[in-house]
Amino acid sequence: MNAWRLDTQEQTVIISSNGGIPFIAYWDVKLTSKEDLAQLLDSFPQDFSGGVMDKAEYINFCPTSGDGFLGQPGIILHDENGIDILPNFKFIDAKKEGGMVFESRDEYNGLSIFHKISIHGEVFKFQTTLQSKKPINVGGLSAP
């Protein structure tokens, strides 16, 4: 599992990805610079399910029906004929650009989604950008 950390003077955000769109694994008081992110991530998520077969999961920045999310999707797309597009994004890259930019792609549907996190004092600003190789209709796109 990949992990990246962003810090302000008072707080730390740890972003992680297990192969799909990244998610917030930790957002709380500032961690020490010596904190072992791998060990911290291994302690999450805790099993609150009472031993059932379903495991606890993080909700990523933009949950989709295409990746098996059963709740309200973070993105609703249709092709030019009104047919649902069920994206299944895979994590591609993370870059430091005025904060962090995370890129995920759905090659099959020709989609790319970028999640940018920038720091302004003690405020984390989240921005989502969707790109498509072909015309699509966006019925909804939620930013984290």
PLM region spans:
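Hydrophobic beta/alpha structural segments that scaffold and line small-molecule/cofactor pockets
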Residues: 13
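Substrate/cofactor-recognition hotspot
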Residues: 23
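Acidic, aromatic-enriched beta-alpha/helix-loop junctions
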Residues: 27-52
